[in-house]
Amino acid sequence: ILFFNIELTAMEKRPYHHLPDGTFRNPEGSPERDPNAKWSYKIFNEERKKVKIEIPNDHVIPRVEVLEELKKNENNDYIAWIGHATFLIKLGNTTIITDPVFSKNTGPLIFGPKRYIPPAINLNEIPPVDLFLLTHNHYDHQDMSTIRNFPYKKSKVILPLKLGKYFRNYKDVNELDWYQEIKVNEDIKVTLLPAVHWSRRGLFDINKTLWGNFLIEYKGKKILFACDTGYGNIYKDLGNKFGPIDLTFINIGAYNFYPMMPVKDKSVYHTNPEEALQISKDLKSKKVIGMHWGTVVLSLEPIMEPPKRFKAGAEKYGFSKDDAIIFKIGEVKKLNQIIN
């Protein structure tokens, strides 16, 4: 009876997203994968080959210009898109990098989808980084080659639970559970918040590491950098608890897996452009940046469809077209041009 009571007490104290076997799950009430889904790598790879790689001339800023803009803005607060979910975010004296991926492939070793657009600059050309944020362990976000060769291993690393083991040679590694926070310095605080996603890198490690969104608070402003996420009711709750948000970064690509999934343009774990706008509305976000597109083919929608739908749907969700922001790869924008 004593052991039973101890076990019951532990269960009562365990957060909902912590399972007894040590794995994690999405917030209560989140959507589940459709039981009619029939995933096939063979079919997916056949369909993926049909996706046309047609890149507009203005999609990418030349590398030399990117380096010039970064140098010119080294004393300003800015945001720069390196590609996919990799951004440089300069806030005061702190330079942040998000989900850095500089490899050619988004998979193990030399496997996985190849990016059709290289990073805006090379890894050895990035400015000194003070804060490294990692949202989850999927290969298009956690790139071990980049982590091993990262030139600023003294930077503070903040990541979800059980991901610290990948950063053995780093000096300041901090794992967070949902709703835990770290004060980075006098100006910046980072909180890990729930997302609707999952984790996996191998055959036997599904959901053994946590995933999450980052809320960055800086001089009275709130910036939310989203993990890959699907839509869920959790975002209304987060909007009520933490909103309004000044600026949200959110995935708008990698949503069409039909015919493996029963519904076209719908993914449980990746928002389509309209769902991304709905999440931003739920968060009471003033502005939103669409990311996770235009870099590598991870799904079957046309590669330039996400930004078009994102802009086209903005007003329906309460945003002006100017407040639904699309970057060019390599583009550098001053923060005060985006949020005041």
Regions found by a protein language model. Give the residues of each.
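Metallo-beta-lactamase
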Residues: L2-E125, K156-C227, D246-I252, R309-E331, L335-I339
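Cap/insert and terminal regions of metallo-dependent hydrolase folds
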Residues: E12, H17-L19, N26, I126, ...
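Divalent metal-coordination and catalytic microenvironments
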Residues: I89, D99, H136, D143, ...
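Active-site metal-binding loops of divalent metal-dependent hydrolases
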Residues: P100-F102, N137, A195-V196, C227-T229, ...
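Acidic/histidine-rich helix-loop elements
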Residues: F102-P119, W198-D205, N256-H270
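Active-site metal-binding motif and surrounding structural segment of the metallo-beta-lactamase
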Residues: F111-I158, G243-F249
